[in-house]
């Protein structure tokens, strides 16, 4: 049975984490996706920016292959790291205001 090649136009229509996982043929755990979907998508966004910067002359097929690898990497990252550890979102990067940390008192 022959499958049709994925296109960049199809890729651009994807919206949900599950859509990307199915598009790239990545097996996934729905419970895991439910908990980590925003973090997976945010990490994937960062990774495709890196792919685009590192490989500007890739063909559509090659780019989609790299994007698939990037999505799988983003998905796998949160199996071993927590969102707090990865600090993808601004809320995790900012220091709380009006808070003094104990380590700051010992300086």
Curated annotation (Swiss-Prot):
One of its GO terms (biological process) is nitrogen fixation. It comes from Gloeothece citriformis (strain PCC 7424) (Cyanothece sp. (strain PCC 7424)). May protect the nitrogenase Fe-Mo protein from oxidative damage. Keywords: Nitrogen fixation. NCBIfam families: PRK14102.1. Pfam families: NifW. Coiled coil: none annotated. The gene is nifW. This is Nitrogenase-stabilizing/protective protein NifW. Homotrimer; associates with NifD. Belongs to the NifW family.
């Amino acid at each position: 049975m022959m499958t049709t090649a994925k296109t960049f136009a199809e890729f651009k229509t994807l919206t949900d984490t599950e859509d990307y996982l199915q598009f790239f043929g990545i097996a996934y755990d729905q419970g895991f996706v439910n908990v980590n979907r925003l973090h997976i998508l945010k990490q994937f966004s960062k990774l495709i920016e890196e792919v685009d910067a590192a490989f500007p002359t890739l063909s559509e097929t090659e780019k989609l292959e790299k994007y698939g690898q990037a999505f799988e990497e983003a998905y796998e990252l949160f199996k071993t790291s927590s969102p707090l550890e990865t600090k993808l979102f601004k809320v995790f990067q900012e220091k709380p205001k009006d808070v003094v940390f104990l380590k700051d008192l010992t300086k």
